[in-house]
Amino acid sequence: MSNFLIRKVAVLGAGVMGAQIAAHLVNARVPVLLFDLPAKEGPKNAIALKAIENLKKLSPAPFGVKDDAKYLEAANYEDDIAKLAECDVVIEAIAERMDWKHDLYKKVAPHIAPNAIFATNTSGLSITKLSEGFSDELKSRFCGVHFFNPPRYMHLVELIPTAHTRPEILDQLETFLTSIVGKGVVRAKDTPNFIANRVGIFSILAVITEAAKFGLRFDEVDDLTGSRLGRAKSATFRTADVVGLDTMAHVIKTMQDNLADDPFFPVYQTPAVLAELVKQGALGQKTGGGFYKKEGKAIKVLDAKTGTYVDSGAKADETVGRILKRPPAERLKLLRETDHPHAQFLWSIFRDVFHYIGVHLESIADNARDVDLAIRWGFGWNEGPFEGWQAAGWKQVAEWVQEDIAAGKALANVPLPSWVLEGAVAEKGGVHTAEGSWAPASKRFVPRSDLAVYGKQVFRAPLVGEAGADPKTYGKTLFETDAVRAWVDDRAGEDDVVIVSFKSKMNTIGPSVIDGLVQAIELAEKDYKGVVIWQPTSLKLGTPGGPFSAGANLEEAMPAFMMGGAKGIEPFVKKFQEGMLRVKYANVPVVAAVSGIALGGGCELMLHSAKRVVHVESYIGLVEVGVGLVPAGGGLKEAALRAAEAATAANATTDILKFVTKSFENAAMAKVSSSAHDARAMGYLKPSDTIVFNVFELLDAAKKEARALAAVGYRAPLRAKDVPVAGRSAIATIKASLVNMRDGRFISDHDYLIASRIAEAVCGGDVEAGSLVDEEWLLALERRAFVELLGTQKTQERIMGMLQTGKPVRN
């Protein structure tokens, strides 16, 4: 089979979505041409150039590293259109106007390479209608590729073919989008707004309709429909503000214009409050006001009755809040039976969505799985709507929905289809089973895609009722304690690498985790090719996602502190350091599979591994200053070793300060990387470390790296000796700048003390510049500083504040 290579991509349209799609492709190291109209004044590429500059200012940041903006090449349709022939994929992302898109297609079509894929990022226009006027050959290479905003962070991409799109085109794109760009791909039918926006926007319209019926405020609704339901924290109206009220109004209009025969058509009317806000130019976050408005430090919410902004903060009824913590079946039953408006409102919005997806599944998606994944990945729900229905008791909920339809309480007078109430789905208790997910058109449960790219996903996004592998029990367990599980993937050819997964809260590291890790390494040295440290929590999507490790387990260390004071902690610190050295000098490669946060001791564990395989959305740093301490698990020691290595390579061992400054600043300022690429720029990742874009491929990639290292005769590094250090003169230089910061009141006296101890550790202590030390010397400096600081009242205040409130104390 020949390789499908994407060497360069063109993005047509440098607006909000086009520019951000281009930025994320650059994150994935795909060269991109960003096209827009030629400017009427100044440089012809001014529009695209301005868009690239604006990307640097956006929050959340579209680039993993801001400087990567230089890899985006600006272009215009007048001077650069011939460059389209260099591109293997062309993605159109201009405004949602069918006529504008057709005009652009006429202009660019003759210049698209004969084997290139042509795609549109439309959020809901008909792909078939967009392809009208194309040659049959170009139609066969055309499809919809719908990214969600913001493209870097939203996992979903919908792939929408027409009747003419060649199947291999879709397979090639799905493979590229999944593995290289890191997305979750759902194939949708060419119906208005596809799957995610069709169901997601309906759910928002249902919320607005039912909220008005029950007389609820917007902030009240958001407290009810956000994290309490396992959905995005921004809930309903805050989400609308973030998306943009004009964008939302456009998506609703697409439904109005194209779904006149839909029994739910009355719901598709633009809500009066939304229409009025758009008319006033209050488009949400981008204009400074929408359903919410920031006034000074206060967040105000729109009062629908008066049209004025009032103080926000309305909360869910306490009884209803308690109901929402009950198991799914009990929760839905209690909501339905409770008279409080909040409970009735919640039952109503659940019923409305269940009714809608039951009626429309066959027309909008191939199967129920695609609906659930689209809503989870595109709208940030922890559970898709079909999953929620199935978890609450399929048949009982279906009967309740039918009763409300018959009573005229539903939003449409249309019955649930027969497949919901009888036959295989009713018998199996839902749409997701061990065989697959229900596809109404073919009347069967269809399995997951067997596209080769999914062979790299040991664990695919699980669904309620599906027979997916459970990462907490999967494979063959070698040993398990309260702190760790060591296991192997027992499939043929996969059982040669020991996988260690932590079981502690936030995967923090205490003595019991260290013991388990050392035991796993000893086991691997006898019978296996390597060790991978991988956490099942990595499968949690979102930002920052599930943690790799939040660092040392302070709570586990507290009894030793209470009994022996600061000195009583020293054995804990020494054990942590020895554990890290055991990782570093293991006789088999230890590979850290990192995603989410890797902070403090979690970062140090990663630094001591033979190799790091890191998900692009990883947030890495030594943050101990936040609790008044210094890194003492070898993180500062590793900084000194790397600085010495760099200085030796540059023949500058008498001027090591410039090589250690970045590491000092990283630790003293508790800097955390904004991405894996940023972590590499900060020095936490080496150029040889691997960055993975799809978190579901992380474990597979890490195992392959461990095997590859073993295959070439891996040997642990020799123990560090004769390490040149920056010494007392460098410490004095750093302290001089710290004094200025302290005297200018940028840092406190205690901040000064902590930063001084970090400087002493990374510079090798009170010795002459260029003096030679060993690893144990550097570790002793860390331990001494850690124990000293732990004995101070201000550090103890910081630790207690963090343990009690989860927030740093400034003192």
Model-derived features: positions:
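Amphipathic coiled-coil signal-relay and dimerization helices
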Residues: S549-G551
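N-terminal glycine-rich phosphate-binding loop for ADP-containing cofactors
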Residues: M1-K529, W534-K540, N553-K575, L581-V588, ...
